[in-house]
């Protein structure tokens, strides 16, 4: 069987600490669903997120996070650390051409919005993310081409990977070892596209935000 390079790999980021939520955000139950006809009610946010990517036309999907398919190579390195871990999971000759990255805490996201993000990114060959009606930038969800700019940034950002991994037991859980998504985007060709619906960008980091989102399902 010959393995083929993946054109666009779907990535669910599920490795956050969920400290403000008080429980694993990936396992929160989304009891009704008005945004994705294929997903059933009472699915976890992890299941919902995977289904969104599938409904957006993504055939290959992985989950990033210590308790999931691709564990973090660098502890507590944030979303960029998850991206680095995913790309490091694939040998050089099977590197995906691009990633469509979705965090596990966007319960109002839609497959159509993700499809638009992917298509705009594929046409431009640029990292592509949403801006809302107030011109605020939302750097995730993100369509991210896997190119030389990204590879150079990740190599420089995580060249101390082994040192950090060896000191894992000495790192406080609240410390962040990875760069921000914004810092990464500054080093790669990128564009923001206007979101047609600000609601899809509503993220849930606290129980109060989760309750607000539930009222909109």
Give, region by region, the residue ranges found by the protein language model.
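Conserved alpha/beta core of the MobA/IspD/sugar-nucleotide pyrophosphorylase nucleotidyltransferase superfamily
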Residues: 3-6, 163-217
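Conserved donor-nucleotide/metal-binding helix-loop-beta segment in metal-dependent transferases, i.e.
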Residues: 110-137
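Conserved nucleotide-sugar donor-binding
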Residues: 137-152, 207
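The conserved acidic donor/metal-binding loop of glycosyltransferases
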Residues: 103-107
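N-terminal glycine-rich phosphate-binding loop and ensuing alpha1 helix
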Residues: 2-66
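Short phosphate-binding loop-to-helix
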Residues: 66-100
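Alpha-helical elements of Rossmann-like donor-binding domains used by nucleotide-donor carbohydrate transfer enzymes
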Residues: 48, 82-85, 116, 212
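Intrinsically disordered, low-complexity terminal tails and inter-domain linkers enriched
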Residues: 31-43, 92-95, 156-176
